[in-house]
């Protein structure tokens, strides 16, 4: 396909090899001028940079529908956990484009495409297991193109795990329904419904490198070992899986955790033995109707009508927090002195 812009298309086959069960941005790490990271290791907490610009300056779309936050431009990939299993291809355009979106796209434009008509007929049931008690079950079925007119595709996902990073657990579902109808040579309609109700523990705070590995810190040229002294100097190292965003809870405590989703004010804690300082919970369903009109060999009109709701939020500290010093063979910040 000829285009005057820097453009890369990641196919379904490439995604299956690169992505596995990671967040969608991780499939683009081999694309020129693209850097993606899973950050602290929380499920869905990935971010992507294009041409040096973070995702606030990258227009991200799913089937032509913009997904950047309307307030700050950020993209919360946990809202689309499981969409990668239904994706047919990802179009990654680097640099400014002619896309008419309110989202600043100086970094580039990313369009995640789930085209039912391009899927072959068949279905699959996939079971994945990994480190950190990770377990993911995926079901997919595609009708293929029926009578050269109609196609339907569905994907259902359930994912759980305690996480490799301490207490970066996940408990998520995902659903996708897509249909396509070719009315005639000039008109095609597509209808989609996507969502991923989920909650997961987060690891968001940066740490001094000595916290993870004193040996590695000592190998870094110019590293000031005294910089680890910020009120208290850790005499032990926590290791790469360290996460300070949680604390132990007395087993006798049976209270629920505050949250807000669809009117519910409280919820059972993920684990009765600990509480996450930073936890994300959200469900952002998306329904859209696309119409593609071919006016001529050189002109096509694309129209998208969509609805996107959502409910959820995240936890965090308010006021002061008591922390215990780092003690060998004891949980970090596990209880107050």
Question: Where would I find each of the regions flagged by the language model?
Answer:
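Outer-membrane beta-barrel transmembrane strands
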Residues: 271-316
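Short sequence motifs at beta-strands and strand-loop junctions characteristic
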Residues: 40-42, 102, 130-133, 167-171, ...
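Structural signature of outer-membrane beta-barrel domains
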Residues: 55, 67, 115, 130-132, ...
């Amino acid at each position: 396909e000829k285009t005057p812009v820097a453009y890369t298309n990641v196919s379904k086959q490439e995604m299956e090899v690169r992505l596995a069960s990671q967040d969608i941005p991780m499939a683009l790490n081999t694309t020129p001028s693209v850097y993606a990271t899973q950050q602290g290791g929380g499920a869905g907490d990935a971010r992507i940079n294009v041409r040096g610009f973070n995702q606030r300056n990258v227009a991200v779309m799913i089937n032509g529908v913009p997904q950047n936050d309307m307030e700050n431009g950020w993209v919360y990939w946990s809202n689309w956990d499981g969409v990668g299993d239904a994706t047919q291809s990802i179009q990654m355009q680097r640099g400014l484009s002619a896309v008419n979106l309110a989202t600043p796209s100086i970094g580039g434009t990313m369009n995640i495409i789930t085209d039912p008509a391009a899927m072959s007929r068949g279905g699959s049931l996939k079971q994945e297991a990994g480190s950190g008690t990770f377990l993911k079950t995926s079901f997919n079925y595609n009708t293929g193109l029926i009578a050269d007119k109609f196609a339907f595709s569905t994907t259902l996902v359930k994912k759980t795990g305690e996480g490799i990073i301490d207490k970066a657990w996940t408990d998520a579902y995902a659903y996708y329904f897509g249909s396509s109808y070719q009315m005639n040579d000039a008109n095609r309609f597509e209808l989609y419904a996507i969502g991923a109700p989920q909650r997961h523990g987060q690891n968001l705070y940066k740490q001094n490198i000595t916290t993870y590995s004193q040996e590695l810190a000592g190998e870094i040229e110019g590293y000031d070992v005294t910089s680890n002294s910020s009120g208290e100097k850790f005499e032990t190292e926590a290791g790469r899986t360290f996460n300070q965003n949680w604390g132990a809870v007395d087993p006798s405590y049976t209270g629920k955790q505050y949250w807000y989703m669809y009117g519910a004010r409280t919820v059972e804690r993920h684990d009765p033995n600990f509480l996450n300082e930073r936890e994300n919970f959200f469900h952002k369903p998306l329904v859209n109707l696309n119409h593609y009109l071919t006016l001529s060999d050189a002109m096509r009109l694309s129209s998208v009508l969509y609805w996107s709701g959502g409910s959820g939020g995240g936890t965090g500290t308010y006021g002061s927090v008591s922390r215990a010093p780092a003690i060998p063979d004891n949980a970090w910040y596990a209880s107050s002195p």
